[in-house]
């Protein structure tokens, strides 16, 4: 299971109201969905080859593997708590 990722920021983009970054971690590219606040900060900074470290929640579904990235462990834990509520995230 992936718990956190640290690596070079390659790109960031949005698709269908979802925000993503691509992180190069020792030659592997990880596509991670991120919060809007972090996306806006990256957009404002506009630095390439910036080192990014994120806490990761890996969700495995029948048809996909999803990585959700957070800038703090507290954000990640809050996300996990929300997912435990019946009907949320299904």
Predicted regions and their residues:
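Structure-specific DNA junction-binding interface
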Residues: 1-84
């Amino acid at each position: 299971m992936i718990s956190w990722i640290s690596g070079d920021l390659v790109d960031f983009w949005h698709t269908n109201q979802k925000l993503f970054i691509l992180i190069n971690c020792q030659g592997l590219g990880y596509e991670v969905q991120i919060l809007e606040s972090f996306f806006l900060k990256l957009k404002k900074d506009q630095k390439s080859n910036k080192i990014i470290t994120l806490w990761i929640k890996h969700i495995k579904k029948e048809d996909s593997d999803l990585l959700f990235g957070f800038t703090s462990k507290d954000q990640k834990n809050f996300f996990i708590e929300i997912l435990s509520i019946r009907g949320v995230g299904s």
